[in-house]
Swiss-Prot record:
Record key words, sorted: Cytokine, Disulfide bond, Glycoprotein, Secreted, Signal
A single MF term (Gene Ontology): cytokine activity
Name this polypeptide is given: Interleukin-10
Role: Major immune regulatory cytokine that acts on many cells of the immune system where it has profound anti-inflammatory functions, limiting excessive tissue disruption caused by inflammation. Mechanistically, IL10 binds to its heterotetrameric receptor comprising IL10RA and IL10RB leading to JAK1 and STAT2-mediated phosphorylation of STAT3. In turn, STAT3 translocates to the nucleus where it drives expression of anti-inflammatory mediators.
Family the entry assigns: Belongs to the IL-10 family.
Main location: secreted
Organism encoding this protein: Pan troglodytes (Chimpanzee)
Disulfide bonds: 30-126, 80-132
Protein's cellular compartments: Secreted
Record: glycosylation sites: 134
Taxonomic placement: Eukaryota, Metazoa, Chordata, Craniata, Vertebrata
């Protein structure tokens, strides 16, 4: 009886113990994050392609909301903060208004937002990609310009979402190389 109990304990412990080559889910997702990034960016681009024409047709303004200074912040020491703030800006200010522009695009804007939330979650789990504290002046400029545009700001911000994806890609490519 004693040996069968010992055998059961050993079997149980062996099943619970992780294999030596495997880390936690968070560690594994961080290990695979650079390889998964192209797929996440593709998913963002695919989701955006479903609403791009709608918002770009309604965007009648010639100026850019997402300027080169934002890309420079993404590439500089404020890259982490600029990325975190811009994701938050799109999720909390832009997307909720964009969903209300037309019932036919609501589901697609929602899907785009879910893809952006997934990216943010993965970035947060992998601290080396999003370890930040400081505020970005370029993001403040984007937010101020967006607010000044009032109802036209939503069309401007959504019509330039592809630029935002490109900036995310530039930031992540830089971080992966480092």
């Amino acid at each position: 009886m004693h040996s069968s109990a010992l055998l059961c304990c050993l079997v149980l412990l062996t099943g619970v113990r992780a294999s030596p080559g495997q880390g936690t889910q968070s560690e594994n997702s961080c290990t695979h994050f650079p390889g998964n990034l192209p797929n996440m960016l593709r998913d963002l681009r695919d989701a955006f392609s479903r609403v791009k024409t709608f918002f770009q047709m309604k965007d009648q303004l010639d100026n850019l909301l997402l300027k080169e200074s934002l890309l420079e912040d993404f590439k500089g020491y404020l890259g982490c903060q600029a990325l975190x703030e811009m994701i938050q800006f799109y999720l909390e200010e832009v997307m909720p208004q964009a969903e209300n522009q037309d019932p036919d695009i609501k589901v697609h804007v929602n899907s785009l937002g879910e893809n952006l939330k997934t990216l943010r979650l993965r970035l947060r789990r992998c601290h080396r990609f999003l370890p930040c504290e400081n505020k970005s002046k370029a993001v403040e400029q984007v937010k101020n310009a967006f607010n000044k545009l009032q109802e036209k700001g939503i069309y401007k911000a959504m019509s330039e979402f592809d630029i935002f994806i490109n900036y995310i890609e530039a930031y992540m490519t830089m971080k992966i190389r480092n």
